[in-house]
Amino acid sequence: MIDQLFRLLYRLAYRGMRVYWALARPRTHGALVALWSGGEILLVRNSYTPYHSLPGGYVRRRETALEAARRELLEEVGLSLGAEGLARVVDVHHGWEGKRDHVEIFEAELPERPRVRVDGREVVAAAFYPPARALALDLFPPVRQAIERRWGAAAGRGKAGLPAPGPAARSGG
């Protein structure tokens, strides 16, 4: 019952924030963590959004994006990683949902799939997905970019996992 109340409050707060973002167009800064294990990526579902994302959230005042990424990873899925295990792979500015958002995505490769835990309030699900299945989901746009970047590079593929263009396509003829 308490968890359901929290989920309702998160949804109401999110809707209110979307109105605020549309009117005020604030600058925001977020940090996310792309965890890969066995060729699969960890995605989360928040109780208040219709899409899948990576563990992460806002960068607090006087906090670096890397510190925020590590903090959010612990808060959202109960995992602690050292800073040395995370590399920034995406740094993008976008206007999705009406805000002027700066998103930094850090990536780590884990040799063994960790056990993750979710609170059932803010984060309601977390699971590892193969890239093709992940890309078929409704994703937060910077998350899609990170998956396409990693999957394409690992498989010698171009955008969205499509085969990279051959020499004739690259040269325009």
PLM region spans:
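Acidic, metal-coordinating catalytic segment for phosphate/diphosphate chemistry
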Residues: M1-L32
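Conserved Nudix-box catalytic region and its N-terminal flanking loop in Nudix hydrolases
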Residues: A31, W36-E76, G173
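Short loop segments at secondary-structure junctions
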Residues: G38-E40, E109-P114, P131-R133
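Nudix hydrolase/Nudix homology domain
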Residues: P50-Y51, G120-G173
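Glycine-centered C-terminal helix-capping/turn motifs at helix ends
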Residues: G78-L79, F128
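A short coil-to-beta-strand element that immediately follows conserved catalytic motifs
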Residues: S80-V90
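Active-site-adjacent beta-strand/loop module that shapes the phosphate/pyrophosphate-binding cleft
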Residues: V92-R115, A127, R150
